[in-house]
């Protein structure tokens, strides 16, 4: 269930986040996420699902013995979250001026994103979900040649560390993390370190070389 892929079409009741000692109010976060969604694609009168909407979707799925695997893609495909992070913190959180990818070497960008993800991880874990897909594909490929640029700029290790940190958040909540394959040991490159063995790799492409 791709609730966060470029846009973020599901808002929790409490969207407040604390980053670097500063708390951003729930309504302010919702407003900035909504603005980011509209900038990506204006869906009209209903741009986001509410928490009660999602509660109902999950309850119906469970009644039919259907398992929900939520997806919030990170650190790429994050147009709405990136827009909100930059607007709220006043820090440019973008990688390579991408409109969709946070800079994994920027501590504010990482802290904001992980704080927001934690709320969704907690929500879906509380609903009994066994897996959480963090995406982790197509890094800033709207502005660069993606993971090749990270390796060239010696930031691939930052990506590995970021993915492992998010995976650890998911595992700590009792779920299994999923990531798409193209950024995992990109082009057989191991210079960034070792990815967590807790991650289930989902193959959607033969990879970009």
Give short role names for the model-derived ranges.
Residues 1-147:
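Feature activates predominantly on carbohydrate-active enzymes
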């Amino acid at each position: 269930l791709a609730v966060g892929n470029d846009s973020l079409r599901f808002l929790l009741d409490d969207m407040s986040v604390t980053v670097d000692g500063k708390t951003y109010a729930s309504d302010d976060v919702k407003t900035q996420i909504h603005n980011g969604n509209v900038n990506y694609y204006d869906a009209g009168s209903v741009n986001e699902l509410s928490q009660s909407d999602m509660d109902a979707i999950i309850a119906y799925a469970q009644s039919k013995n259907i398992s929900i695997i939520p997806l919030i893609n990170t650190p790429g495909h994050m147009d709405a979250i990136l827009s909100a992070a930059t607007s709220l913190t006043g820090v440019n959180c973008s990688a390579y001026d991408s409109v969709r990818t946070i800079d994994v070497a920027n501590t504010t960008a990482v802290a904001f994103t992980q704080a927001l993800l934690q709320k969704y991880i907690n929500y879906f874990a509380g609903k009994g979900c066994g897996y959480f897909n963090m995406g982790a594909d197509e890094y800033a490929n709207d502005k660069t040649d993606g993971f090749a640029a990270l390796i060239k700029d010696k930031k691939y290790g930052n990506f590995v560390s970021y993915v492992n940190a998010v995976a650890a958040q998911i595992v700590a909540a009792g779920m299994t993390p999923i990531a798409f394959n193209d950024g995992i040991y990109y082009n057989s490159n191991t210079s960034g370190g070792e990815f967590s063995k807790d991650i289930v790799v989902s193959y959607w492409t033969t990879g970009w070389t």
